[in-house]
């Protein structure tokens, strides 16, 4: 209850609004985020360790997955702050931590959308245009694209942090600090709505369009009668389907509801207080789905990357029975091959790309990039 935070509050003044009753929402968030923290933190920490220490992140898709795991791990590390707030119904920490925590959530959500987009686009380039776009499928290019994604989400994190300053309300003659909620109408009508719409376009709509288009083209190409039939093809399809499911389950519901809520709060659509409250109630559930993406992403690594899966299996094997570790360049994460089905010449080139790279192959060689 709000009264639990009395030790951290100050006396009120008449200009402070009465606190809305968010206790039921806070309890729900505390339960779900506790589960996300308990599962997402070890899973993503383990995934990051496997990518960096065991597989050495030599292939293009593993570069993207490594950065996705880093983004998810950063979000899970911020969850204890949220859990403390939801338990006390009051923000007991300095204001900049509220701003930082709110910005990290936005960074993770839009960063995840962009990294998943890069994974899908890489599969599109490998399967639909293996010759024309092979110059883009190099680890060096992948690392630069990931740096660009981090730069973009950090750029948006600055205004996101500014709008996440704690707000104040009163409960039984004490002042309570709210975080992540109760943005004022003036803020929505000012800089918050334009920032939201820009982030939705660059961080959600464009990645969603790219994921849907690239997945559709890959599925169409692999469904042709002359397509290469292989287990690797099925694993490629499985990876793209997993990315689509994450988008449709985690990101589409939240971002769609958030856009509607923003339009209502900015009074761009005629509405009543009851309409706002109903949409906000839906939004508070959808935000939990968005946060759950950091639990689903490690499952994608496990079921779509054979090298990742074998590494986890070997962790439990006796030391003298474990296979020799590879350097990430040969035989590692080899299930997302470049399969060409456009013509005989392209198919021959694609089959060359399917071969594991030799230990002497330079890291930026395209044959090395063909494997995840």
Swiss-Prot record:
Q: In this UniProt entry, which cysteines form S-S bonds?
A: 98-179
Q: How does it sit in the membrane?
A: Multi-pass membrane protein
Which Gene Ontology biological process is one annotated for this entry? behavioral response to pain
Main subcellular location? membrane
State a single Pfam family of this protein. 7tm_1
Positions of glycan attachment: 4, 8, 13, 173
Where does this one sit in the cell?
Answer: Cell membrane
Q: Which GO terms describe its molecular function?
A: G protein-coupled receptor activity
UniProt GO cellular component terms: plasma membrane
Extracellular side, ranges: 1-30, 81-100, 162-191, 265-280
Similarity annotation: Belongs to the G-protein coupled receptor 1 family.
Give a short account of what the protein does. Receptor for lysophosphatidic acid (LPA), a mediator of diverse cellular activities.
Q: What is this protein called?
A: Lysophosphatidic acid receptor 5
């Amino acid at each position: 209850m709000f009264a639990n935070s009395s030790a951290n509050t100050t006396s009120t003044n008449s200009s402070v609004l009465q606190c809305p009753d968010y206790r039921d929402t806070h309890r729900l968030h505390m339960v779900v985020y506790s589960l996300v923290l308990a599962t997402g933190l070890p899973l993503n920490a383990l995934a990051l360790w496997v990518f960096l220490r065991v597989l050495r992140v030599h292939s293009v898709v593993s570069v993207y997955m490594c950065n996705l795991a880093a983004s998810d791990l950063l979000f899970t590390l911020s969850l204890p702050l949220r859990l403390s707030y939801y338990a006390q119904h009051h923000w007991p920490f300095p204001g900049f931590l509220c701003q930082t925590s709110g910005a990290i959530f936005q960074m993770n959500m839009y960063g995840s959308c962009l990294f998943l987009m890069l994974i899908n686009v890489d599969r599109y380039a490998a399967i639909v245009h293996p010759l024309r776009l092979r110059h883009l499928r190099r680890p060096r290019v992948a690392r630069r694209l990931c740096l660009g994604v981090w730069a973009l989400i950090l750029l948006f994190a600055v205004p996101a942090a500014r709008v996440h300053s704690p707000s104040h309300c009163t409960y039984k003659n004490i002042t309570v600090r709210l975080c992540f909620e109760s943005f004022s109408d003036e803020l929505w009508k000012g800089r918050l709505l334009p920032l939201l719409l820009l982030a939705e376009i660059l961080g959600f709509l464009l990645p969603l369009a790219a994921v849907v288009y690239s997945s559709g083209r890959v599925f169409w190409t692999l469904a042709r009668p002359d397509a290469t039939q292989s287990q690797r093809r099925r694993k490629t399809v499985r990876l793209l389907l997993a990315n689509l499911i994450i988008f449709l389950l985690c990101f589409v519901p939240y971002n769609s509801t958030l856009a509607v809520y923003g339009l209502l709060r900015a009074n761009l659509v005629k509405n009543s207080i009851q309409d706002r409250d109903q949409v906000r109630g839906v939004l508070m559930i959808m935000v939990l789905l968005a946060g759950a993406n950091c639990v689903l992403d490690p499952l994608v690594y496990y079921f779509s990357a054979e090298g990742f899966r074998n590494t986890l299996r070997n962790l439990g094997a006796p030391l003298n029975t474990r296979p020799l570790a590879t350097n990430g360049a040969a035989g590692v994460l080899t299930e997302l091959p470049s399969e060409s089905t456009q013509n005989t010449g392209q198919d021959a080139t694609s089959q060359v790309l399917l071969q594991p790279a030799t230990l002497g192959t330079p890291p930026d060689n395209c044959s090395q990039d063909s494997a995840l």
